[in-house]
């Protein structure tokens, strides 16, 4: 990157003096974020309490004892003493908040992320050329701190910032905004890619004494929008700083250890932060085709869901601009469900399942068609598809299910979500049904559960051995491939039940214990190439994590109920060695296949023996009668079919078992009939035309068990009988017809309402998926793409140590992602991707295989075959990976079945995943440790904390009513677990426990809940700002409070308490829904507030159903930067369906503004009557509808084109001389200008405006909140902004001089042809440049950098796009506009007599935009003068390469051959680097076929092309 900028150095003085100190063009984004109060953990703070083991100090002076007394005080100077460490050297770390490390700066001349210092000497830290912090370290000389070697210094405690909160706030704001690894949560990277960036930082740091709002505007425009590209769905940075308890030390030897101290030890190869991750769905199957963004780069998840990230950094996942969610990269397997809170996470999982196809090994593949549809709704897609809606049984509540209406799925039946859904389903041959969740963690001692599992798995040598457990796949048929593995979740919801089998979901889940890992514990590939000495470690149970169970066992009285989540296991009873694929029975009753191993026969024998209480044993000549309501078993085979059928019976190998068919269950004797094998429902055997329908799933509308049957069965179980159910229940079991089945399972402490499969496919699939396997051997070249022009790691030739660049530079966001190498080939004029992947099954001869290898070697010169035959996951070479032997099916390479490895270690690890009581107690003790400054409790290691926290979030983040049952074994700790719940829920959970007096006192004493003497008695204290790493139990209960209204949260700080009583209000609401684009939607503000925990009723008089939303707020769950400093509940928004002429009643946990969205195709309104609400300030149609002093804490302004939400005091608008009227007019002017930029001037058709007066109720939305999901602001509906100052009387947004609102709304509106690959954070800013030109007279954003653009293009060797960041790439569009200013005449396209649309401009400085406006219109199919210029619209046609379209469109519209310009920029390209190469390589961009096409048009070359432009046009502004 230095090379890229070297030519800029000579211009620094001019650039800096001209612009840096001038602010942001007279005004800025207005983006403001209150930096949360931070408890500093700086090393300069003296230790509060003595080290508990100070004895080494007085005694270690065995040499003369001249003065043994001076020890208490260091002033006798330690030098006379002969100890080896009189003033021990220590290692310091510059941090934010004591825990978030700052890298890229220097302290005392060394890296700020690990520098040496001697206690007593000052520490001086420099970033760029500016001293940003000085610390006095005298306190570290205390003898009590001798053992503490690692010390964190918080920037906030720097001497330069002492005594000024504004300086502290501004310094943190600048540092976080300058962060070059924005997705990382543990580090902030001050690594400047150019001298320009460094000087910009220096200049701004000198201005930190400005008012925070003014300073923030400077930062937003000068720093944030020059961000490096490809770091996140949005490269915006977050100003949130971790909140830590004062006095903590990042040293494990300290008396008070910080929560994330372990990260300060991660320096060896196995501890390196850079990791390989795997994105999986709720069943543990890899999810391919999802965009992911880290500071280490961006990419698309590989064939098995693989991605690269920096350990501990935030990884953001999305599809195009659709933000699925973010998660902290602290484990090897990231489940979709972890990308949000449990509801949101399950919805993400459902969304991906719905819009994905089935790949190899049941992986999910998001096809390009989904991306293309989403791209039509940039950023606004985030509001159209609401990931926060309740989703029936899809709550990700650990092993618990929240039985809510599936509003998430229902949203696809209306509005723009329906339009998107319809478009995707049409392009992908239909959409899948929804599904469900994932679990991690452990801690249970051996006991009954372990013993039973050992028996059933055959670990107990008295039982039959089971080493490979067979998992059947769904009988769907996509591209000839069978469906995903199906082990439907069977969750234990009380201690009466426990799991029998849970499939692994850790990063190396498909590798058995003892095998070499494919990924290290940081989810990185092992770099084993010479001279590295890294050795892959073995897979062990210590690193195993598990999904929810799909086989569980519950107790009812003396009896046992076992449920297995797939009906095909019945076929094993019929043909125990012929069930896996295309089995069956011939006319003689003989099994047609007999080749399957004995494992599943052994398992079934173990099950039959155990459930019959040894009344039947294999090989023992015992007899047993089994009762059943099954007539038929079905064998798995190819196709969307039920499979070959046979009468339900037992194979002769199960000797002595006879079958009796039952239709009722009264008075059954367990001694005579010890076991029943039942189904709860009829099978679905006819799937019609639905390609996603699963044959043999339970038809919950046709129950086979009546309530009387269930009563009889419970009686039978109570007497000691056993019931085995093998069934696939794909329902949340809300149906009345399912109530009997639900009751039966509930009696045993079980639930199948989770409605998801929980078994991962083996890693097979399309060629672009890393770490995959096929049935036969494969050859694959997997690599890490280059970062900033170099490999992302180095190997020390002497030590063999691997060092990852992102770690050395402290840029966790730069963590690379493993990929299968690919290249583009020109095939018939289209660019097609080829992957460095060979399946030996495709090559029948050695010559054919050799030729395939040679093709790869030719594409990647210097590439060699891998050399270690004992390890099959090497990277940076052509690797051979043996096959699995399991046949794969169809074009998606899905295996016929999945196998799970079972052994004693697996059994042990699995049981340890489910101990709720121990887990919650350990998290409580960890929180006590931090709440008492280390005096009480016990700190968990950060690794254990993450595991326990993630596991408990699965169990707690739902509204499942857990219970403890006396007299039953409680190995899962339900007694302790429910006691904690009752302390927070005011003993709402009836059953065997209540909140004990001792636990309640402890919680009250430690400020976790409010005591009886408080005015807030019965509420929990959310302890904002809340860091889950220090207060995990509080965070877990705060998360649960969204679902469980028995947990009442103190809302005084956020969103604000309302003391007034609710009232009855009737409002008339528009129901009309006809948006041009989703980001200018028809959600209607009511001006009413739903108070927290109070019942609200809404009565509708509308003739159409509507959606009611309370509170517009992002979901922060899993957003790591926010999780360490939450200032509000992570999930706030609630959504309800309200039927036509119906009534809805609800309580919301925290309060919020109420919104209503109708879906009427006609322009109509209806009245709604609200009960229990209070009014909120509401300025609409130029007047106060509800006055400013209304009781709600938030208010809104509604103009013709915008709805603006903000704390009510802001609506005083004291910074606007024209008050709210002027502000509303400015918002509308911006909206109108945006219509102009995109060439939209009509009320219908191709060029329909986003908003206009004849489209009532459809408006852009902009909402301010105390914390938002990503960055200072982000796009969507609404656009969200983190400016939240409840005590300010000023509005934080200035619509006609505000880069932030232009940038974010520009995200929403960005359209082809500007949106090429890599332009996510660029194309939107072209609108902002247009606004600067139109209202400020000059493109200030690019005015300086464009002066050196021609030199940059020469330096970049025709790869300027790939080498540049967002700021550099914006120059391409700016050069094109400035060239068009003098070289493009719009009138040529509008012949005489054709009126020129009014949005075109002849004003100086605006004429160049005419080119862009016409390009936009042409891309939408505008036909004006097409016949005059060749008849073919090159803007509206695509060969699949967006960069080709951009070049051809621009050249055709300009009627000029711009090939030289596009060759120098090569938009759409990206860079990578081969192992050992010293130079970058590039791929993608404009194809040769596009240049050929352009040449064939025979357009004139420009005399001076856009590539020569080095200045912007400046227009002296007058009022427009």
From Swiss-Prot:
Bias-annotated ranges (Pro residues): 51-77
Lipidation, S-diacylglycerol cysteine type: 24
Endpoints of the signal sequence: 1-23
PROSITE patterns: PEPTIDASE_M60 (PS51723), PROKAR_LIPOPROTEIN (PS51257)
Molecular function terms from GO: transmembrane transporter binding
Chain spans, region Disordered: 22-107, 226-247, 1498-1520
Domain of life: Bacteria
Subcellular location: Cell inner membrane
Stated consequence of mutating residue 1498 to K: In strain: O15:H- / 83/39 /ETEC
Coiled coil: none
Keyword Transcription: no
Transmembrane segments: none
Pfam family, one: M60-like_N
Lipid-modified residues, N-palmitoyl cysteine kind: 24
Annotated family: To V.cholerae AcfD (VC_0845).
Annotated protein name in UniProt: Putative lipoprotein AcfD homolog
Species, as recorded: Escherichia coli (strain K12)
Gene coding for it: yghJ
